[in-house]
């Protein structure tokens, strides 16, 4: 996806320090202090324009949410949605997923959402996929024993790749749907991409998984 560069995005984000965390590394191990409570922290990696993470924060005030999107020109749209949602349990961060361990302490994150991640279809780009074992190693360190990864995509190839990657990593698959919108699953909050692709008749794939610590 080609992103239109917005040279003013960084300044706009920094105008809202109550939402946008400019230096998340400063709060490693201290995110409960950022939110002012002991509620669990959930993160979405690749938040895009923020429809999902804002919707989740509004629907679940007892959970703290952090939307992570490395492109500031995209994250600024998530900022607008966060402002509109008018919630106190949402923060936004501009960082690459490879740097998550610089921002969060071991076991500090209760749940991770991966929604419509870039499929990186070329074989030479496999390591860039957010469900690649390199990233799974990072997630395993961030999540506590009961922590889960929730993954949604419209891309069948990426979903099949992820099923194999999770299984080979010895993860436990606790939920799998090959057509989410025609399943019994309740409480789904759609992303912008999800609305777009489902409107065209594409099935949405979803799974939940956790690490087998035994």
UniProtKB/Swiss-Prot annotation:
Catalytic reaction(s) noted: guanosine(46) in tRNA + S-adenosyl-L-methionine = N(7)-methylguanosine(46) in tRNA + S-adenosyl-L-homocysteine
Pathway annotation: tRNA modification; N(7)-methylguanine-tRNA biosynthesis
EC number: 2.1.1.33
InterPro entries, A to Z: SAM-dependent_MTases_sf (IPR029063), tRNA_(Gua-N-7)_MeTrfase_Trmb (IPR003358), tRNA_methyltr_TrmB_bact (IPR055361)
Classification via CDD domains: AdoMet_MTases (cd02440)
Protein keywords: Methyltransferase, S-adenosyl-L-methionine, Transferase, tRNA processing
Enzyme class, first EC level, given as a word: transferase
Active site: 118
Family from the record: Belongs to the class I-like SAM-binding methyltransferase superfamily. TrmB family.
Name the record gives this protein: tRNA (guanine-N(7)-)-methyltransferase
């Amino acid at each position: 996806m080609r992103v239109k560069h917005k040279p003013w995005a960084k300044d706009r984000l920094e105008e809202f320090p109550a939402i946008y965390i400019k230096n998340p590394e400063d709060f490693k191990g201290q995110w409960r202090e950022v939110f002012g409570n002991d509620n669990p922290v959930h993160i979405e990696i690749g938040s895009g324009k923020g429809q999902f993470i804002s919707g989740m924060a509004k629907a679940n005030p007892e959970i703290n949410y952090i939307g992570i999107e490395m492109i500031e020109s995209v994250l600024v749209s998530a900022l607008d949605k966060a402002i509109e949602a008018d919630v106190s349990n949402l923060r936004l961060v501009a960082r690459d997923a490879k740097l998550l361990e610089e921002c969060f302490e071991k076991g500090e994150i209760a749940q991770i959402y991966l929604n419509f991640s870039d499929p990186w279809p070329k074989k030479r780009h496999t390591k860039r996929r957010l469900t690649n074992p390199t990233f799974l190693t990072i997630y395993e360190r961030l999540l506590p024993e009961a922590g889960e990864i929730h993954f949604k995509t419209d891309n069948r190839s990426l979903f099949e790749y992820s099923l194999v990657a999770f299984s080979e990593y010895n993860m436990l698959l606790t939920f799998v749907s090959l057509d989410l919108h025609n399943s019994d699953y309740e409480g789904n909050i759609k992303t912008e991409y999800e609305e777009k692709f489902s409107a065209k008749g594409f099935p949405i794939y979803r799974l939940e998984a956790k690490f087998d610590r035994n």
